[in-house]
A protein has these predicted regions:
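Extended alpha-helical targeting/anchoring segments
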Residues: 1-266
């Protein structure tokens, strides 16, 4: 199940949240293997060569599905999921050096969900969709769950101390190296990062709710795929496709948001 939402409810355009559950088909890229699962239970696996492109595979997979209805206001069907940074080598001519990976999650995962709930928070209304393949409509069951009493919230607590894959000194050396390459003209920008890990006990969705309450970023997401969960936030949309046009919004401190869409556009 996944949750896509916005905390920027000041205008109608940014007021839609999506809840998707009951995946009936999916496409996954992990360890050079592209796996596809279809609603009829059939599956297919393709062993990829180094840097083999997957865009056409993804496009062909998505084109197999269509719905009987379309909404101009909401995304009522389609594939929902994520593409990690490391997947870029299967879309562009970029070669990564081999590294020991201790986070075993797919580089890319998209699913076709049987149920999609589009919530217009601005108007306080919800639209429920069911995509059925040789199965009966389950909207009555979904409505029953929504009308049930609110579930119990669970606690969240840290266990032990946080740790990182880099020490402070090691990270400082990386920054110096990045500055050196900028001065040389090899690159105009380098985004450096380090990973922090924190053991915990409790419900990670509680942590997401805390992030949502304190983070000013308008776009937030929570993905629960059973074996792993991914959640976070973004200051702005990186790619927007609307009315047949695609807009790219670089994310690197290039655009200051005021909270007022009209003022931001000016």
């Amino acid at each position: 199940s996944i949750l896509l939402e916005s905390s920027d409810y000041g205008v109608n355009d940014n007021s839609v949240a999506y809840i998707c559950f009951n995946p009936i088909a999916d496409i996954k890229l992990q360890n050079q293997m592209l796996s596809m699962r279809h609603p009829d239970g059939k599956s297919k696996q393709i062993q990829l060569a180094d840097n083999e492109r997957v865009a056409k595979y993804c496009s062909d997979f998505a084109k197999q599905f269509s719905g009987n209805f379309k909404s101009e206001r909401f995304v009522s069907n389609g594939l929902f999921g994520f593409t990690s940074y490391d997947a870029v080598q299967h879309f562009e001519d970029i070669q990564f050096s081999e590294k020991e990976e201790d986070v075993h999650i797919p580089q890319m995962y998209y699913a076709l969900f049987q149920n999609v709930i589009a919530i217009n928070v601005f108007n306080n209304e919800a639209h429920l969709y069911a995509h059925c393949y040789q199965t009966k409509n389950n909207l009555d069951e979904v409505v029953a769950v929504l009308q049930a009493p609110n579930p119990t919230t669970h606690s969240f607590s840290r266990q032990g101390e946080p740790h990182s894959n880099l020490t402070d000194d090691e990270f400082v050396e990386l920054v110096k190296k990045g500055i050196h390459h900028c001065y040389r003209g090899d690159v105009f920008q380098i985004v450096l990062s380090r990973r922090f890990s924190q053991p915990f006990a409790g419900d990670d969705f509680t942590l997401y709710r805390v992030l949502r309450s304190v983070n000013p970023s308008p776009y937030l997401f929570y993905f629960d795929f059973g074996d792993y969960q991914i959640f976070g936030s973004s200051p702005e949309a990186q790619l927007v496709v609307k009315n047949g046009k695609a807009e790219i919004h670089p994310i690197a401190g290039t655009f200051r948001r005021t909270g007022n869409d009209k003022q931001d556009a000016e």
